[in-house]
UniProtKB/Swiss-Prot annotation:
It is found in: Plastid, Chloroplast. InterPro entries: RuBisCO (IPR033966), RuBisCo_large_chain_AS (IPR020878), RuBisCO_lsu_C (IPR000685), RuBisCO_lsu_C_sf (IPR036376), RuBisCO_lsu_fd_N (IPR017443), RuBisCO_lsu_N_sf (IPR036422), RuBisCO_lsuI (IPR020888). It comes from Cryptomeria japonica. The disulfide bond which can form in the large chain dimeric partners within the hexadecamer appears to be associated with oxidative stress and protein turnover. The active site is at K175, H294. Keywords: Acetylation, Calvin cycle, Carbon dioxide fixation, Chloroplast, Disulfide bond, Lyase, Magnesium, Metal-binding, Methylation, Monooxygenase, Oxidoreductase, Photorespiration, Photosynthesis, Plastid. This is Ribulose bisphosphate carboxylase large chain. Mg(2+) binds at K201, D203, E204.
Amino acid sequence: MSPKTETKASVGFKAGVKDYRLTYYTPEYQTKDTDILAAFRVTPQPGVPPEEAGAAVAAESSTGTWTTVWTDGLTSLDRYKGRCYDIEPVPGEESQFIAYVAYPLDLFEEGSVTNLFTSIVGNVFGFKALRALRLEDLRIPPAYSKTFQGPPHGIQVERDKLNKYGRPLLGCTIKPKLGLSAKNYGRAVYECLRGGLDFTKDDENVNSQPFMRWRDRFCFCAEALYKAQAETGEIKGHYLNATAGTCEEMMKRAVFARELGVPIVMHDYLTGGFTANTSLAHYCRDNGLLLHIHRAMHAVIDRQRNHGMHFRVLAKALRMSGGDHIHAGTVVGKLEGEREVTLGFVDLLRDDFIEKDRSRGIYFTQDWVSMPGVLPVASGGIHVWHMPALTEIFGDDSVLQFGGGTLGHPWGNAPGAVANRVALEACVQARNEGRDLAREGNQVIREATKWSPELAAACEVWKEIKFEFDTIDRL
């Protein structure tokens, strides 16, 4: 090559494989306010130093590849590369480390959770030098979060739409989740809403199966909620699941829901995908629909302590992609969820500003600026005896969802709804009077049974039901 045509890439180029840590481990780096920060739990293969493992994560999730390439010289790696800037051992784990990685903002497309995850939790998770890798947390800077619409409406707008304040909202997933005809399904919806619930819900795997096509379900559920509204004088809703095999079909279902005049639709955001979810969230804001989000498939990703991605990351991603509700575990029910960890990501969903707090699994201070909050939904194996704990743990800005705990009532669906509404009102009143629900909760429920035979019957049925298993995902 003549000197006149010599490129920058040819200057100092040396072919071959080099240690990642020579380029991507930078303990002297001072993070910028605009950097996206990640905390990875890294388990290196035997013989791989933690600095090399952390640098490999930074490289493979940003600009690096397995060998030196000519085209490195055609760009500014110092501007675009991810940097492993700190490594700390995990207490009690001999071979695990927390690697902190900083990513320049220019690596990511604006307003795209899909692009963000494709880089940060992409091929690097299959890297052979690592036995396991888990993304524990992300810090999303305001410079990036402001490129997202976020939730279609948020907590305050939802309360204003429903005209319901000062208490958690009550819901119920219709059971059996599969097999009912559309008319029988709508009947169950009506009975639950008439009994005092605010919402009923399609189960996550109810889409448009042969036993109940989506259009029939939408029509019967709309009829049910309008009838219940007329009889109770309260605004009601049913989460109509718009999830479908294509984005076009999903949007068609959302459009039909809007034409029916219902207040809320639903999406399975992990199985449906972030691109579909963000599209639906934009439609919901533009057309006045609330958006309920189910997290089906999350445990495949987040349940193991050493590999995958913690749910707090999925929760942050959902807040950016868009949703007004999201299932967040119960702490006390049948599904996985340790109290402090759960409250950590519940705050990340609801609050504007969340301080770093390692005792709750929050690795970074997060400032959402003006992005609306998301209501956490407690659902899964809960019943009236859990009501005091749920009210105390989740507070007013939440949805408490009882499926079997409503429809399993010995007297029927409407009495099951009455029992839950009475239990909730009793707990809220007791709390407002200054009583300690954590200590006096059972007594509050027993007192309420004296003036609600429906609640008394529910308490008798579920007095021995417990789900006492150790939580897998602990700090």
